[in-house]
């Protein structure tokens, strides 16, 4: 009976200590992030909830940047440069 009372007391204490939302409260109602002291892997801090807590948002919720499309190869290939060097060496070596 004492053991059962001890278990119930421990469970009651744990419900007060462990947060139900997985480590943090929601940042803002329209933001899909949580206020935490450290962000998990795969998350980034968008802004500060309080002086010690960051609003951590998963990378999957962030917009992807629009990168410019590259046309063609802007850098000369290494094989082309080595061909030029080989031609120069052949012309200087031959008497």
Curated annotation (Swiss-Prot):
Signal peptide limits: 1-22
Region (Disordered): 72-95
Protein task: Has antibacterial activity.
Entries under PANTHER family matching the protein: BETA-DEFENSIN 123-RELATED (PTHR15001), DEFENSIN BETA 118 (PTHR15001:SF7)
Gene name, Swiss-Prot/TrEMBL: DEFB132
Family listed: Belongs to the beta-defensin family.
Statement: the UniProt record of this protein carries the keyword Secreted: yes
Keyword Disulfide bond: yes
Record lineage: Eukaryota, Metazoa, Chordata, Craniata, Vertebrata
Protein name (database record): Beta-defensin 132
Gene Ontology CC terms, in alphabetical order: extracellular space; sperm head
A Pfam family this chain is assigned to: Defensin_beta_2
């Amino acid at each position: 009976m004492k053991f059962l009372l001890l278990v119930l007391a421990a469970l009651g204490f744990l419900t007060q200590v462990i947060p139900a939302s997985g480590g943090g409260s929601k940042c803002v109602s329209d933001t899909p992030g949580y206020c935490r002291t450290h962000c998990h892997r795969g998350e980034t801090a968008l802004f500060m909830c309080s002086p010690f807590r960051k609003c951590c948002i998963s990378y999957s919720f962030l917009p992807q940047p629009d990168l410019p499309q590259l046309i063609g190869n802007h850098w000369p290939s290494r094989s082309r440069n080595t061909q030029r060097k080989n031609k120069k060496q052949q012309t200087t070596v031959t008497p």
